């Protein structure tokens, strides 16, 4: 083949390939246009699959175009149908106590930003349980921790945080501002109450659903104060015990019945109880029982029994000869249902609790009768009604070589059980006045719940080495 023929052959081949490429491009364009109009003419997409749960609804859309499948998950919050808590169940049988939570706040605070607190407690709602306490508005390592031994200041607030964590500026929720508090959930929303202001003219602000609803002025001009642990609600009615007046003489105590943060009724204290402070309350069988502190006379604890539906109450003293306040005298040979058992020094009292359920009754107290050290649980059948009732079982919670403090009751009323399981917490106070080498006074928390099994004892003390804070 001569050179001219080669050129002609190569040119013809190139032209042929160019034409083929052009035809392929035209065909591809036409195919895309055709597919586009074909998809546009398709019938409406079928109703997406809906996967529903109690709390959310998940919608799954499957859209297929050009052999590509796009799956879109849309999560919609479903309005939960909540109802008011109803205290119809009895207390569960308890043969011992199992550990629920321990926050180790002081140990962690040696090297972390942990808030200075006191007067802690736990309270539950339909989603779970949270820890609460009155913050001092500073951290353990902060310079403002000096002077936090004092109970009342403008810097205190009721805070809450996830159970088991240590409270820090980064994980707490501010419930309300004040130096005395209570809080409870009615099944629909939470009510929190805080007292603040000067000793001679304090006031309470009642919050419901995250908003302030009601204000209550002082009625005796002497440190208006409340429970320092959770209140309890039944069918929307949430009774709260408040006291205004002397800590070492006759004071004015009221039981105030709230619904959605609004006052429904106010009762003056009636019955045999002579002095009421810092009540620890729980509910079962449509009755609320509050075990309180007589800071004036009694080493036996006052008991207020509340009918939340009728909005009425009675009061008396724990009948058992097992005394549970601190300070206290030695246990007498017989208890007293109608009057305080006097004696004990140097401290006039401490917040405490009991679960009073006939043969299934348990009392908590410090192991030391003179100071807030150690903690024990005693099973005392018929402690509420029998002056001869004594302990038949015993469990150490904190050994007597370690500090304890306030204690109180709480129950997860929304747990899926046939009964309400009793739970309690113990405040583990560290710092001043007993440990004066540091400037602060604060606490950690341990919480336990009832078990039908017979479990062993252990000491759940705070465990922080104060020397590390120097």
Swiss-Prot record:
Q: Which UniProt keywords apply?
A: Calcium, Disulfide bond, Glycoprotein, Glycosidase, Host cell membrane, Host membrane, Hydrolase, Membrane, Metal-binding, Signal-anchor, Transmembrane, Transmembrane helix, Virion
Where is it localised? Virion membrane; Host apical cell membrane
Q: Which GO terms describe its cellular component?
A: host cell plasma membrane; membrane; virion membrane
GO molecular function (one): exo-alpha-sialidase activity
Keyword Transmembrane helix in record: yes
Residue numbers binding substrate:
118, 152, 277-278, 293, 372
Query: How is the protein modified post-translationally, according to the record?
Result: N-glycosylated.
| UniProt topological domain (Intravirion) ranges | 1-6
Q: Virion surface side of the membrane: what ranges?
A: 28-470
Membrane-related topology note: Single-pass type II membrane protein
The protein's matches in Pfam families, at most eight in alphabetical order, are given as: Neur (PF00064)
- Residue sites binding Ca(2+) per the record: 294, 298, 325
Disulfide linkages recorded for this protein, renumbered to the chain, are 92-419, 124-129, 184-231, 233-238, 279-292, 281-290, 319-337, 423-449
Please summarize the record's notes on activators and inhibitors of this protein: Inhibited by the neuraminidase inhibitors zanamivir (Relenza) and oseltamivir (Tamiflu). These drugs interfere with the release of progeny virus from infected cells and are effective against all influenza strains. Resistance to neuraminidase inhibitors is quite rare.
- Give the InterPro entries listed for this entry: Glyco_hydro_34 (IPR001860), Sialidase_sf (IPR036278)
Q: How does it assemble?
A: Homotetramer.
Any domain commentary? Intact N-terminus is essential for virion morphogenesis. Possesses two apical sorting signals, one in the ectodomain, which is likely to be a glycan, and the other in the transmembrane domain. The transmembrane domain also plays a role in lipid raft association.
Name assigned to this protein: Neuraminidase
Question: Per the UniProt entry, what species is this protein from, by scientific name?
Answer: Influenza A virus (strain A/Gull/Astrakhan/227/1984 H13N6)
- Quote the gene name from the UniProt entry: NA
């Amino acid at each position: 083949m001569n050179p001219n023929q080669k050129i002609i052959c190569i040119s013809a081949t190139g032209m042929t390939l160019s034409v083929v490429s052009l035809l392929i491009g035209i065909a591809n364009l036409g195919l895309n246009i055709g597919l586009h109009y074909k998809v546009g003419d398709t019938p409406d997409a079928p109703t997406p699959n809906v996967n529903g749960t109690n709390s959310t609804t998940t919608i799954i859309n499957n859209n297929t175009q050009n052999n590509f499948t796009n799956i879109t998950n849309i999560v919609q919050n479903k309005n939960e149908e909540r109802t008011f808590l109803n205290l119809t169940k009895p207390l569960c049988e308890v043969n011992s106590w199992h550990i629920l939570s321990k926050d180790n706040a002081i140990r962690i605070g040696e090297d972390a930003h942990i808030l200075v607190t006191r007067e802690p407690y736990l309270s539950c709602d339909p989603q779970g349980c949270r820890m609460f306490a009155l913050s001092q508005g500073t951290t353990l390592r902060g310079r403002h921790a000096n002077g936090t031994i004092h109970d009342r200041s403008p810097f205190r607030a009721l805070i809450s945080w996830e159970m088991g964590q240590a409270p820090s500026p980064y994980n707490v929720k501010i419930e309300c501002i004040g130096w005395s508090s209570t809080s409870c959930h009615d099944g629909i929303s939470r009510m929190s109450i805080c007292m603040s202001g000067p000793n001679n003219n304090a006031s309470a602000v009642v919050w419901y659903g995250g908003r302030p609803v009601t204000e209550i002025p002082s009625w005796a001009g002497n440190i208006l104060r409340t429970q320092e642990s959770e209140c309890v609600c039944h069918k929307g009615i949430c009774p709260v015990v408040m006291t205004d007046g002397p800590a070492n003489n006759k004071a004015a105590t009221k039981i105030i019945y709230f619904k959605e943060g609004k006052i429904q009724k106010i009762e003056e204290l009636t019955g045999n109880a002579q002095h009421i402070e810092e009540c620890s309350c729980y509910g079962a069988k449509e009755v609320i029982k509050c075990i309180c502190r007589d800071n004036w006379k009694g080493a036996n604890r006052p008991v207020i029994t509340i009918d939340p539906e009728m909005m009425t109450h009675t009061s008396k003293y724990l009948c058992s000869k097992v005394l549970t306040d601190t300070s206290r005298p030695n246990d007498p040979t017989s208890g007293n249902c109608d009057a305080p058992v006097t004696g004990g020094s140097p401290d006039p009292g401490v917040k405490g609790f009991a679960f009073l359920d006939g043969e299934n009754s348990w009392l908590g107290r410090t192991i030391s009768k003179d100071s807030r050290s150690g903690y024990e649980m005693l099973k005392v059948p018929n402690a509420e009604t029998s002056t001869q009732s004594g302990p038949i079982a015993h469990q150490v919670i904190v050994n007597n070589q370690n500090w304890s403090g306030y204690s109180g009751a709480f129950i997860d009323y929304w747990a899926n059980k046939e009964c309400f399981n009793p739970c309690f917490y113990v405040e583990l106070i560290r710092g001043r006045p007993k440990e004066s080498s540091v400037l602060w006074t604060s606490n950690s928390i341990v919480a336990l719940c009832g078990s039908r099994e017979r479990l062993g004892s252990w000491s759940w003390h705070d465990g922080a080495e104060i020397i590390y804070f120097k």
